[in-house]
Amino acid sequence: MSPRSCLRSLRLLVFAVFSAAASNWLYLAKLSSVGSISEEETCEKLKGLIQRQVQMCKRNLEVMDSVRHGAQLAIEECQYQFRNRRWNCSTLDSLPVFGKVVTQGTREAAFVYAISSAGVAFAVTRACSSGDLEKCGCDRTVHGVSPQGFQWSGCSDNIAYGVAFSQSFVDVRERSKGASSSRALMNLHNNEAGRKAILTHMRVECKCHGVSGSCEVKTCWRAVPPFRQVGHALKEKFDGATEVEPRRVGSSRALVPRNAQFKPHTDEDLVYLEPSPDFCEQDMRSGVLGTRGRTCNKTSKAIDGCELLCCGRGFHTAHVELAERCGCRFHWCCFVKCRQCQRLVEMHTCR
């Protein structure tokens, strides 16, 4: 192997290690709880954290269970959004939790980084509003009377604190060594796009006060959207993600569309550096599990249909008996009694 080839291989290895380590903190989702953390030494034992995240853990012990919850939210939402796709956001019990898929600069990695940073921002924000954290509470900057005439009151979600903590904790790996590399730029951009998906969908919730249900006085507060809405928004961004490449702009490096005919991406869009594999066949070297054995929809022409999901390999059909409740009746007072029925259904799985 030539010296140039050796150098290129070394760079690819460093790139893979860097990219994997950046998302290893998601392993916190595998823990049942980190709420029992009471000593700083425990932070050293949390699997998947880099040293600067360990230091943040020691300074913010009470927040770490919210970080764990945010990681769980991210994984669950990813699996929901991609449940009918060839890549269905499967996780492993090892590092990184999404396998080697996230070490590549693909659309899938872009979504994982975006939904993960959003998960932490969301969970920490909700913990603030619930009074679970001493360092933060409701957003007291929202007060007075709005231009629409209602009174700002109640507990507005402190999204500023949640976003700031997500930036400090999630972005720390990219903002250290190699922060100007193309993959670091991609990760940082998608992390921020995830947080903006919450910010742009913040809601105003209100309550009426008055005699007999009238609305003489209306008090309102700002609230984060349901996380499912954040997931839907980021899935749309995934479908319209922009392929980019690094380019020097002035004295710094930036990501620009690879195709000059495409419009420049915004801060809310997802970006990726390389095309995705087709995810059809198992390839453990690249972290692809394949679609063999996956359940498919025989009548669908979309990606969840047997033709596309099974990549043209065909599918098996089996008749399966399912047990379900039927003939339910309400009995006074107060319970519902049902019979157990068997139903025969057709199941289709990819060859």
Swiss-Prot record:
Q: Which UniProt keywords are given for this protein, alphabetically ordered?
A: Developmental protein, Disulfide bond, Extracellular matrix, Glycoprotein, Lipoprotein, Secreted, Signal, Wnt signaling pathway
Q: Which GO terms describe its molecular function?
A: cytokine activity; frizzled binding; receptor ligand activity; transcription corepressor activity
- List where in the cell it is found: Secreted, Extracellular space, Extracellular matrix
Concerning PTM, the database record says: Palmitoleoylation is required for efficient binding to frizzled receptors. Depalmitoleoylation leads to Wnt signaling pathway inhibition.
Entry keyword annotation includes Disulfide bond: yes
The domain of life for this entry's organism is: Eukaryota
Q: Which PROSITE patterns does this one have?
A: WNT1
Q: Where is the lipid attached (O-palmitoleoyl serine)?
A: 212
Pfam annotation, one family = wnt
Which N-terminal residues, if any, form the signal peptide?
1-22
Q: GO cellular component annotations, sorted alphabetically? A: cell surface; cytoplasm; extracellular matrix; extracellular space
The GO annotation for biological process reads: adrenal gland development; apoptotic signaling pathway; branching involved in ureteric bud morphogenesis; branching morphogenesis of an epithelial tube; canonical Wnt signaling pathway; cell differentiation; cell fate commitment; cellular response to estradiol stimulus
Attached carbohydrates are found at 88, 297
UniProt entry tagged with the keyword Ligase: no
Q: List the disulfide bonds.
A: 78-89, 128-136, 138-155, 206-220, 208-215, 280-311, 296-306, 310-350, 326-341, 328-338, 333-334
Spell out where the chain crosses the membrane: none
Question: Mind telling me which InterPro entries this protein's record contains?
Answer: Wnt (IPR005817), Wnt4 (IPR009142), Wnt_C (IPR043158), Wnt_CS (IPR018161)
**PANTHER family the UniProt entry points to:** PROTEIN WNT-4, WNT RELATED
Biological role stated in the UniProt entry: Ligand for members of the frizzled family of seven transmembrane receptors. Plays an important role in the embryonic development of the urogenital tract and the lung. Required for normal mesenchyme to epithelium transition during embryonic kidney development. Required for the formation of early epithelial renal vesicles during kidney development. Required for normal formation of the Mullerian duct in females, and normal levels of oocytes in the ovaries. Required for normal down-regulation of 3 beta-hydroxysteroid dehydrogenase in the ovary.
Q: How does it assemble?
A: Interacts with PORCN. Interacts with PKD1.
Family per record: Belongs to the Wnt family.
Protein name as it appears in the record: Protein Wnt-4
Tell me which species this is from.
Rattus norvegicus
Taxonomic classification: Eukaryota, Metazoa, Chordata, Craniata, Vertebrata
